[in-house]
Every structure is written in C-alpha cells, then in structure tokens.
Design a protein with these regions (language model features):
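Short acidic/glycine- and proline-prone juxtamembrane loop motifs at membrane-interface regions
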Residues: 57, 157-171
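Membrane-interface transmembrane helices that cradle and orient dolichyl/undecaprenyl
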Residues: 137-142, 178-193, 204, 229
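Perimembrane helix-loop-helix junctions
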Residues: 16, 185-191, 214-258, 262-263, ...
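Membrane-lumen/periplasm interface segments of multi-pass, membrane-embedded glycan/lipid transferases
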Residues: 266, 271-337, 370-376
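Hydrophobic/aromatic-rich transmembrane helices and adjacent perimembrane loops
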Residues: 213, 359, 370-393
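Hydrophobic, aromatic-rich transmembrane alpha-helices
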Residues: 128, 315-361
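Short helix- or helix-capping micro-motifs
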Residues: 148-153, 176, 180, 197, ...
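Transmembrane-helix motifs of polytopic, lipid-linked glycan transferases
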Residues: 117-143, 177, 181
C-alpha cells in the first residue's frame, strides 16, 4: 500500500473512531470540549492577567469569607479590632462579618478543598458553558446550543469575570442550572427535575437576591400562566395534575432557599429582613432617591438611572458581549428568524430574561457606580471588568 493509501486508511479509522465515540457517549462531544476550553481559558487568564487579583476589592472579601467558612466561622474576632478591619466587613457584638452572602465564598472554598482557591474558577466556567448549552438545547436544538456555547466563549465579559473571584459567574451558573432543570422538568414531566430547579433558584436567591429575582421572573410568569388548568381540575374533581406537582416542588425548594437566606440574615444582622449589605450601608440598595455607601452619595433619579443604564447596556453590546459589536446584530437576526418560525414558550421565556435583566437593573444604582465618571468611558470598574451586573445577558 502506498503512503497516500495508508494516510487515507488512517484518516478513515480515525473518523470511524470518532463516530463510535459519539455513539457510545451519552453526552455530545462538542459541549464537553467547549466546557473544557472555557475551564482552560478561565484558569489561564486568572494566573496570567489577574495573578494578584483585579482592581475590585470585593475579591478580598469573598476570599476572606471562603477562608472563614473552611474554618467553620461566620464571624471574625480579632484581638484588636481597630487594627484589623477587612474591607466591607460589618462590626457587630458577635464579631466582624462580611457584607455579602456566603454562597459565592462557599464555591471558592470548594476550590481550596481541591487544592487551591483558583481551581474553583475553571470549574464554574466549565459548568456555566455546559449549562448554557443545555438550556439553549432545550429551547432550540443541539446545533443552536453549540453556537450559544461558542458565543459565550467569545464574550470578553464571560472570560474576564470567569477569571476573578467575584459573585457574578457563580450566580449565573446557579441561574442557568435553574433554567435547565425547569425546561427539562417541563419536557419530561419529572418532579425530580422541578425540585432541582427550585433548589438552584433558591441558592441563587441566597447568593444575590435581586439577580435571581430578575432571572426567574419570566419563568415564574410561565409557571403561573400554566397553572390555570391544574388549579381548576383540583377544584372540580380533587385530582392533582402533574403540572401542579412540579410547581409545588419548584416553589417549595425555592422557598427553602429564601428561608435559609433570611435565617442567615437573622444570625449575622439580628433581623431576618435586613441583609448584610444593608447593615453595612442602609442606603446602598434598590430604589431611586438618595443612595450612599461609605462616603460616596448620589441622588439616583429615574433620569440618571436611565442614562447610566443606557451607557452600561451600550458597553455590553458594543464591547463586552459575544463577538463584540457584531454580536447584537447577530442576536437580532436570530430573534427575527425565530419569530418567523413561531416562538416556542421556552424561547419566549429566555427573551423575557433579557428584558427583565435590562429593565430591572435600572432600579439598581450599582450600574451608576460601575461607570465612574459618565463622560469618561475609560473610567470606573466597567473599563476593566465589564458591565458585570448584566452578566446574565
């Protein structure tokens, strides 16, 4: 046999081997490979671009909190408190505690248990990529899911946030787990998947309540809309339909997450309705009017909110989203093509998430702070870390 003939034969055997591997594997190879690429990219960026962390001091808070959790502590009790006061920690009679919920810190603590805090970053990036593929596959098909995962890897916001110790990537991972489990529960009718959805959204609420609410709002709307028939059946013949069972499972586990969050508040702040960030800065939160944190104060008017959020969204679509400036037109073309084929309810829910994230963030003054000086696009944390409050987009 000639050398060319042997090369052709070897290529044929390789192709046949790949086909057999695809047939034998219950998981498609493309999303698995993309998840591994995401993990490698996150770790590489974390040790090359951010070896000493980013300019966002919140990273230190989450790493300190992770170290505390590994030691079984919710409070720090230094011998001389005035000489040891970590960034964004609240002073209380029980000791010092961070202004953030412990969910993100727990994720990073798992990385330390595996060998290093940084090991959590590639794990979150891989899980986020795989879950996004799963969500889009449920709503569209395998090919579109792969395209979505590739688009995620082409997003500077995803790459940067996956390489730093901040809460946005881990919370999005939980939100995507909720979406995937919810879609899978509706397709299969299995209550177990509905329970997973509830647990995931409950954890997301514990991590970042407002972020979870904005993401879950379209799903809640769908859940309520589809309950009319099952509730009527329950009133008429006392039968509990599968849809109602799934809704109860999701709501129950989700409310458990809310209860855990409120219980944590009660332990650290003394009031279940006062979150740690409110104890640290009562005017640092949702709403219009006077907003304040540390020595920085602004009158967050609706007009200022709209201007700031318009600038943030523009930064997302022009610089930080998938494929940069061409990403938004491609997304519009995709939406138009989907509309021509008639929207499935899953697709409508995902479109609703984009709307709820954009509109809901207007009510949060953090999108003003991330910009720094409005007239200077190179100012503020958005210049180096992106519009991270819109990470779910």
């Amino acid at each position: 046999m000639t050398r060319d003939g042997r090369d052709v034969a070897d290529s044929g055997r390789l192709a046949a081997g790949v086909r057999r591997l695809r047939a034998a594997s219950p998981v498609p190879l493309a999303p698995l490979v993309l998840a591994l690429v995401a993990a490698a990219a996150a770790y590489a960026l974390s040790v090359t671009v951010f070896p000493y962390h980013s300019s966002n001091h919140d990273e230190a808070v989450y790493l300190q909190q992770a170290a505390m959790l590994l030691e079984g502590q919710l409070f720090l009790t230094p011998p001389v408190e005035d000489a040891f006061r970590p960034w964004f920690f609240v002073d209380s009679s029980a000791g010092l505690y961070p202004k953030y919920a412990p969910v993100t810190a727990a994720v990073y603590a798992l990385g330390e248990l595996a060998g290093a805090f940084r090991y959590a970053l590639p794990a979150v990036a891989a899980a986020t990529t795989a879950l996004l593929y799963g969500v889009v596959r449920e709503a569209f098909d395998h090919r579109t899911g792969v395209v979505a995962a590739v688009a995620l890897l082409c997003s500077p916001l995803f790459l940067v946030q996956s390489a730093v110790f901040l809460p946005y990537a881990p919370t999005t991972m939980l939100n995507l787990a909720f979406a995937f489990a919810y879609f899978r529960a509706e397709r299969t009718g299995r209550v177990a998947w509905a329970a997973v959805a509830g647990a995931a959204v409950g954890l997301a609420f514990f991590s970042r309540p407002y972020t979870a609410v904005l993401f879950a709002a379209p799903f809640v709307a769908h859940a309520v809309w589809t309950l009319a028939g099952p509730v009527a059946s329950l009133r008429e013949d006392r039968t509990v339909r599968p849809t109602l069972r799934r809704r109860v499972a999701t709501a129950s586990l989700g409310l458990v997450g809310v209860a855990v969050a409120l219980s944590y508040n009660a332990v650290v702040t003394g009031d279940p309705l006062v979150f740690p960030y409110e104890a640290f800065a009562p005017l640092d939160g949702l709403g219009f009017g006077t907003r304040e944190i540390l020595d920085y104060q602004r009158d967050y008017t609706p007009a200022l909110a709209l201007e700031a959020n318009a600038r943030v969204v523009w930064q997302f679509v022009s610089r930080w989203g998938p494929f940069g400036v061409v990403g938004a037109p491609l997304a519009v073309l995709g939406a138009v093509a989907t509309a021509r084929r008639e929207w499935r309810w899953q697709q409508a829910v995902l479109a609703g998430v984009a709307g709820s994230v954009v509109v809901g963030n207007v009510y949060f003054w953090g999108n003003l702070n991330v910009l720094g000086a409005l007239a200077d696009p190179g100012d503020g944390l958005i210049a180096s870390l992106g519009p991270y409050y819109h990470f779910d987009l």
